From Swiss-Prot:
GO terms for molecular function: nickel cation binding. Belongs to the UreD family. Its main location: cytoplasm. The keyword Cytoplasm applies. Keywords: Chaperone, Cytoplasm, Nickel insertion. Pfam families: UreD (PF01774). The gene is ureD1. UreD, UreF and UreG form a complex that acts as a GTP-hydrolysis-dependent molecular chaperone, activating the urease apoprotein by helping to assemble the nickel containing metallocenter of UreC. The UreE protein probably delivers the nickel. Required for maturation of urease via the functional incorporation of the urease nickel metallocenter. One of its GO terms (cellular component) is cytoplasm. This is Urease accessory protein UreD 1. The keyword Oxidoreductase does not apply. InterPro entries: UreD (IPR002669).
């Protein structure tokens, strides 16, 4: 399967955040939320819906997002994604590219990705921010379904602001000896992480029971939580974000 979806949001003259381009292609279906939030000048809210079984071996799926100057977008998932083996040889790949112009804001909050046994999946996220742009990008990985060891997973995250790299991170899953190491995942099945580039940066790192909030040297912060299940991991992530100086803005809900 080959698929490309695209989303563009701009700030209208009346102060509303307007979806100017919305192009879906299975397995990615983009559904905008209409009504009160947009009319009141809140962010444009778009839901990310899986409309076909994917990713499977050999699939190539791309999502491209552009947020104009001063505009705000919240792109949120509705259900978990399951990476599966396929009849074709070779790995599957999902690529997310996000561009945010000056003064723009993006919140990319997909649901979890479950890496099933025998899957071989690559996930790449690249975020390019202009000066004074804001972003929060979440990733939740569930390593195997119940009672199942995960297949192979490689994720990479690249965040750049005004040409300066803020985060370049890669994670490789599939080596059982590493999975049990305290310096790796310590046997945890779920990893939740969120990269935050907002109005303020944490003055110092914070941490608790299997969660942490670490300021990045070039600006922004990385919140991380590991746990035996997704609910606990996301609670840990919420606790980490609660120690961010912009916690109130980062923990609000839009329904």
């Amino acid at each position: 399967m080959r698929a490309t979806a695209a989303l563009r949001v701009e700030l209208a003259a009346d102060g509303r955040n307007v979806v100017r381009e919305l192009r879906s292609q299975p397995p990615i279906t983009l559904i905008p939320r209409r009504g009160v939030a947009s009319a009141a000048g809140g962010p444009a809210v778009v839901h990310l819906v899986g409309s076909a079984t994917s990713p499977m071996g050999g699939d190539r799926v791309d999502l491209r997002v552009h947020v104009g100057a001063g505009a705000a977008l919240r792109l949120s998932g509705t259900a978990a994604t399951v990476a599966l083996p396929g009849q074709r040889t070779g790995h599957s790949r999902a690529t997310v590219r996000i561009e945010v112009e000056a003064g723009g804001t993006v919140e990319y909050l997909p649901e979890a990705t479950v890496v099933s046994g025998r899957a071989d999946h690559r996930a790449d996220m690249r975020v390019e921010l202009a000066e004074h742009a804001r972003a929060r990008c979440r990733e939740v990985l569930v390593l195997g379904r119940y009672g199942e060891r995960p297949g192979v997973l490689t994720t990479s995250t690249h965040v750049v602001r005004a040409g300066t790299p803020l985060l370049r991170q890669r994670l490789d899953i599939g080596e059982q000896r590493l999975a049990a190491s305290a310096g790796y995942l310590a046997g945890a099945r779920v990893l939740a992480a969120e990269t935050v580039v907002w109005d303020h940066d944490p003055a110092a790192p914070a941490g608790g029971q299997w969660w942490s909030l670490a300021p990045l040297s070039g600006g922004g912060a990385l919140a991380t939580s590991v746990a035996a299940d997704a609910v606990t991991a996301q609670r840990g992530l919420a606790e980490a974000l609660g120690h961010h100086p912009d916690a109130e803005a980062l923990t609000r809900e839009l329904w």
